[in-house]
Amino acid sequence: MMRCRFAIAICALLFMLFPLMSAAQTTQSDDLKKSIDSLNDTQKAILKELQDIKKLLANPPAARPAADALPSAPIDVSKEPFKGPANAKVAVIEFSDFQCPFCGRYDKETYPQLIKDYVDTGKIKYVWRDYPLSFHPNAQKAAEAAHCAGEQGKFWDMHDRLFANQQNIAAADLPKHAEALQLNKSMFQQCLDSGRYAADIKKDIDVANSAGISGTPSFLIGTVQPNGSVRVTNKLVGAKPYAEFKSAIDKLLSPPGGGGMQ
């Protein structure tokens, strides 16, 4: 009798454990399937990367000039906004981004002194070129806004205002800046909506890239040629102190064999 009861208990226990064993097998099966799926996804990702690398090797991008390389050909600045005399001996070309904090720092700390000492005295031509960085979402439209203000003779006024209000240059803010500058609002908005300066800004970016520029602010300094183009002799990258600009500019303003400016 005892053996019979023991056998019945064993059977009952096995009957109770069977669903658990089945569930464990199902769980293991699910885990195995997930592992296989994950492995397949990984293999697909690796395969895609290999395919991308193969395409890149087949069509390599054009090599960009080294960061310290200077443009071999003079740069045309005939259609760019500038300050100072058009026929100045020396030109400074700024490639900048209205949303860039380093550009804002340069505009606050160095730019005013350069304007006072070299532009207002007629010694240099100061040229602006756009280089809105792709990770600054407001930079492109801000650049277009400055050129739209330029149609009403206030490019530099908008330039100054955008840098003074870098935290408020989203698309919705631009009409407010136009109003503060007393621009014709409808003309400004029509210009901004048209996007007609986007192509010119893209050309500025291309020129910067060909000159080995990849960040802002960057500056090309050189001598103005008879046709108005600029033969670059110096490159400065970053919000450099005034002294570095002064050194580069004074060397070009000094006569051959002469000393620096007093």
Feature locations, PLM:
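Bacterial N-terminal signal peptides that target proteins for export
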Residues: 1-11
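Bacterial N-terminal signal peptides
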Residues: 9-19
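C-terminal cap of thioredoxin/glutaredoxin-like
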Residues: 28-39, 43-44, 176-262
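Divalent metal-coordination and catalytic microenvironments
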Residues: 92, 158, 188
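Structural alpha/beta surface segment adjacent to cysteine/selenocysteine redox centers
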Residues: 98-179, 184, 251
